[in-house]
């Protein structure tokens, strides 16, 4: 499976993977609006041995097959901060 990756210009570190270049027809209109302009950044073959920096290739393939796209969002800030216990 092949994916085309686009970066949101409104949401930092947010990317959309689609199976066809420049085809955002599977994205719900409110989501597309909230992302703003999308800039092409990469085309990638989603092979079993392929590693992605911030996403699981199996999940990307599954969501693209099921929904027609995969949305990669940054990890929440709270998940990056160490937990403090009293």
Curated annotation (Swiss-Prot):
> Which parts of the chain span the membrane according to its record?
none
| Classification via SUPFAM superfamilies | YcgL-like
Report which superkingdom the organism of origin falls in: Bacteria
InterPro entries in alphabetical order: YcgL-like_sf, YcgL_dom
> Which Gene3D superfamilies does the UniProt record give?
YcgL domain
Q: Which PROSITE patterns match?
A: YCGL (PS51648)
**Sections of the chain in a coiled coil:** none
Q: YcgL domain: which residues?
A: 1-85
Q: Which Pfam families match?
A: YcgL (PF05166)
Q: Which HAMAP family match?
A: UPF0745 (MF_01866)
Which PANTHER family does the record cross-reference, listed alphabetically?
PROTEIN YCGL
The protein's name is YcgL domain-containing protein Smal_3906
């Amino acid at each position: 499976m092949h994916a085309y990756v686009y970066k949101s210009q409104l949401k930092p570190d947010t990317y959309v993977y689609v199976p066809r270049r420049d085809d955002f027809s599977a994205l719900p209109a409110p989501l597309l609006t909230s992302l703003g302009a999308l800039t092409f950044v990469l085309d990638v073959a989603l092979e079993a041995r392929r590693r992605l920096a911030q996403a699981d290739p199996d999940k990307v393939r599954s969501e693209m097959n099921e929904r027609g796209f995969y949305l990669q969002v940054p990890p929440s800030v709270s998940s990056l901060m160490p937990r403090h216990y009293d």
